[in-house]
Amino acid sequence: MVFGKNIGDETICVVGLGYVGLPTAMAFHSVGFRVIGVDVSDRVVNKLNDGESPLIDSSSVIEIPVGSNRWSVTSDFEKSVPESDVVLITVPTPVNPDNSPNLEYVKSAARSVLENVDRNRRTAVVLESTVYPGVTRKVLGELCESMGLNNEIVTLAYCPERVNPGDFERGIESVSQIVGCDDQVVGSQLARLFAKITNESSTYVGKMEVAEASKLIENVQRDIDIALAN
């Protein structure tokens, strides 16, 4: 693999341990990866380290792997990011009062990640949060440029989260994955990486904007289906 390891040997860092990030982190752990979960909330970190789920109505179906030597949870970006081969950003993207997208969580998480990458190795930074086409390149790409992080240090990608928050019975393994990345080699490797956690397809689709647009179209289709049903 381009990160210097065989697929399956990577350390995966998941930033944002909510309804998307926590199941994603646990899915990678369950298939053998070393996983570092990062969250800025002390409540979330403390609950997970005590073996409790911070998610409402999930305790009966989510078992936190406390005690596993492949699982750790922290709020410390400085220690966790440099140890990781792949960093997944799974933070919320709410809307502002005027219905414009609020990207502050994405910007804050991306900045904390990029400030702490190991410049002596390549790290794949994958945004999973729901965004409009162009955000990964504009927000994360411009941060990389301002910090002097070229593609040999940080390779950006987008893989839209497609789980249904709160649906703990139909998990991430039931959802197909798509990956957009300007680097075809890394994008293809990331698609194979995500294939480890799903029973459905995992496909490299080319540019990041293609993957971003696919999530937007999926959401529009869902809204149309709901409107027609009503």
Task: Show the residue positions of the predicted features.
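Internal alpha-helical scaffold of NAD(P)-dependent oxidoreductase catalytic cores
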Residues: 142-158, 163-230
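Glycine-rich, N-terminal phosphate-binding loop of Rossmann-like dinucleotide-binding domains
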Residues: 89-92, 129, 182
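N-terminal Rossmann-fold NAD(P) dinucleotide-binding loop
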Residues: 21-22
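Glycine-rich Rossmann-fold phosphate-binding loop(s) that bind the pyrophosphate
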Residues: 17-18
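Gly/Ala-rich phosphate-binding loop of Rossmann-like dinucleotide-binding domains
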Residues: 25, 29-30
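Rossmann-like NAD(P)(H) cofactor-binding subdomain of soluble oxidoreductases
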Residues: 95-162
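Conserved N-terminal Rossmann-fold NAD(P) cofactor-binding segment
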Residues: 2-10, 34, 40-86, 93-100, ...
